[in-house]
Regions:
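Extracytosolic ligand-binding ectodomains
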Residues: 2-11, 23-395
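Sec/Tat signal peptide C-region and signal peptidase I cleavage site
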Residues: 17-23
Length: 395
């Protein structure tokens, strides 16, 4: 009997140790980003910088998660491919036990992942993917902290109206991002009866020569060229349009914020001046306390100012940690409820919410949309002219 009691006591002690160890396991947050072609690896690295500093913030100033548990980042490369993105999400959820997955940059990847996520139940937060259906399908698991296609298009139609442009050439990659923006531009221009002449040309994201379609653009004599390429095709279009004499005589608008990256002037030393581009953050914008901490930590580590991709990567990871705290659980259903019903601190002064709103605004929080212009070679993006400022969810 004494031996039995000793064994039972030992078993209880071992169980207690195991449970304590389990309770102290880190909270894993998944980061799915493009780190290799045909994805945009520069975007992936910038988002990763933000995510890694977010872990430092969570385990430092924030004081951990659920008491004394640390946060940990698990990173997967989506390669900008849907099949790789789905496999990466499955690994993060099934093998690494991530409580949520964020970092998504390519819309096609995020859309494909969400079809799997709605079955597995672990939520996703789009960091820089804008296709309407990411949130427009109203999946409980799908959240976003980035501008959506209709808002981006509304911003550049404002720009087109202000400039009095009528003939618009749109060169769009055949991805959900590219096709979605082209279709949304057609839709809104018809609804507003803008009487625009739209030339819409498409190309494969893996294209290495855009000369044939750029020659069609040149023959069209547009007032504006909208470059809806991501990563290498976007850079290629800038250079080849200049070689063919389309730009700078005809202005070009880049559909996202690639020109703010430190590498931009290395790639386009002679062709970058005069370009217009979309941005989501102005250095005049007020940061939250967490955002100020991040900006200082980023500059100390990388010797340069943070850009939007890094800021939003940081924000999404700390939002997930806050949601775990508010839910008092890592259970996906509890996490989703917390995300839907609470307010969260991010890098902006405004708090972030994910209301069950109508249409594409479901589970969506958006930064402002800016259109900036470089007016000189090697210009710091923070000195670029602000041509259009279009409201998002942030002030």
């Amino acid at each position: 009997m004494t031996s039995m009691l000793r064994l039972t006591g030992a078993a209880i002690a071992l169980l207690a140790v195991a449970l304590t160890a389990r309770a102290a396991d880190p909270i894993v947050i998944g980061l799915e980003i493009p780190l290799s072609p045909p994805g945009d690896p520069i975007a992936g690295q910038l988002i990763r910088r933000g995510g890694e500093l977010a872990i430092d913030y969570i385990n430092g100033p924030m004081g951990g998660v659920l008491g004394d548990r640390k946060a940990e980042l698990s990173v997967q490369d989506s390669q900008g491919r849907t099949e790789s993105g789905v496999a990466a999400y499955r690994r993060l959820v099934s093998e690494d036990h991530a409580v949520a997955v964020t970092g998504f940059f390519h819309s096609s990847v995020n859309l494909a992942v969400n079809e799997v996520a709605k079955e597995l139940g672990v939520p996703t937060i789009a960091t820089q993917a804008s296709a309407s259906d990411i949130t427009g399908k109203h999946y409980d698991i799908a959240f976003r902290t980035h501008v959506i296609d209709p808002v981006r298009v509304s911003a550049w139609l404002d720009f087109i109206k202000r400039k009095g442009f009528k003939r618009i050439a749109m060169l769009a990659e055949t991805t959900d991002y590219g096709i979605g923006l082209a279709q949304e531009t057609e839709k809104q221009s018809k609804e507003e009866k803008l009487d625009l002449q739209l030339q819409i040309l498409t190309f494969d994201h893996a294209s290495t020569d855009l000369t044939p379609i750029l020659l069609q653009v040149k023959a069209f004599h547009p007032d504006l060229v909208i470059n809806i390429g991501v990563g290498q095709p976007m850079d290629l279009m800038i250079e080849q349009a200049a070689t063919l004499g389309i730009t700078p005589q005809t202005p070009m608008l880049i559909s996202y914020d690639a020109p703010i990256r430190p590498q931009f002037w290395q790639l386009h030393p002679k062709t970058g001046s005069g370009l217009y581009f979309i941005a989501y953050y102005s250095p005049k914008q007020q940061l939250s306390d967490a955002g100020e901490w991040f900006a200082k930590a980023y500059e100390a580590k990388y010797n340069e100012s943070p850009v939007y991709s890094s800021l939003n990567g940081f924000g999404d990871v700390i939002i997930i940690a806050q949601a775990v705290e508010k839910a008092k659980s890592t259970d996906p259903a509890a996490l989703i409820k917390a995300l839907e019903t609470d307010n969260f601190n991010s890098w902006t002064a405004a708090s972030v919410t994910f209301p069950r709103a109508e249409g594409v605004f479901f589970h969506n929080w958006s930064p402002p949309v800016l259109i900036l212009q470089y007016t000189a070679a090697n210009q710091d993006w923070k000195d670029a002219s602000i041509v259009v400022e279009h409201a998002g969810s942030a002030p």
